[in-house]
Amino acid sequence: MGGIVFNYIDPVAFNLGPLSVRWYGIIIAVGILLGYFVAQRALVKAGLHKDTLVDIIFYSALFGFIAARIYFVIFQWPYYAENPGEIIKIWHGGIAIHGGLIGGFIAGVIVCKVKNLNPFQIGDIVAPSIILAQGIGRWGNFMNHEAHGGPVSRAFLEQLHLPNFIIENMYINGQYYHPTFLYESIWDVAGFIILVNIRKHLKLGETFFLYLTWYSIGRFFIEGLRTDSLMLTSNIRVAQLVSILLILISISLIVYRRIKYNPPLYSKVGALPWPTRKVK
């Protein structure tokens, strides 16, 4: 059976004339949509207007996508410097989640400022949705046969008790590979379940920071298995370095805010405005 693929998945879902619609885009859209509905329930419980998230999600998704591409291009600049026409060809692949998080975060904070919303409250509301969307989105990598780990044997994959369609689609160019997409997807969904259940016990802003911490811990270890990492040097993977920084920053902010401000419990506040400094 080794080397025989019975259920190889075509990355293209269907064609509309000359346009190929890929499973990757469909799955990303599904992840965003499900995340929106999850966040919408939390939004209503918090006493915010039901349309509050529309602009936040639109601009965060738009600028997050752009930033994810820019981030990838920066760390692959030698290639794109010689092939500048490839920069806009996003359908050839090449986006980075950390870049998307940075762009989406900046856009979200700006929208909160314009709409007079509390960014800590909004961050807590959307954090579980973000990690859920990430967990779903990793299946887009599976459909594209990308973002996999290093070589393994078929026997190793069978020992994980994986469905055959996953094992067979991890056979790429004559070799089986670690299904790192699955490892991260499971980690992210577990994070979603945890965050949804502990959010009401956390102080304002902490759900978002714990999301960054949880995601970064998983990403750090899973990244070490991947073969397509963006590299800062020959030994330093960009995603692992960024993950360490996010863990340290997030934990530090949780501790600092508890000592300095002692914020209220997330579950004990209604709709909050943009935070202002009190003048004594």
Swiss-Prot record:
UniProt main location, coarse: membrane
Keywords (A to Z) from UniProt: Cell membrane, Membrane, Transferase, Transmembrane, Transmembrane helix
Gene Ontology BP, a term: lipoprotein biosynthetic process
Annotated positions binding a 1,2-diacyl-sn-glycero-3-phospho-(1'-sn-glycerol): R138
PROSITE patterns named in the record: LGT (PS01311)
Protein origin, superkingdom: Bacteria
Cited Pfam families: LGT
GO MF, one example: phosphatidylglycerol-prolipoprotein diacylglyceryl transferase activity
Protein EC: 2.5.1.145
Gene Ontology annotations for the cellular component aspect, listed alphabetically: plasma membrane
Function: Catalyzes the transfer of the diacylglyceryl group from phosphatidylglycerol to the sulfhydryl group of the N-terminal cysteine of a prolipoprotein, the first step in the formation of mature lipoproteins.
Protein family membership: Belongs to the Lgt family.
Protein name: Phosphatidylglycerol--prolipoprotein diacylglyceryl transferase
Gene name of the encoded protein: lgt
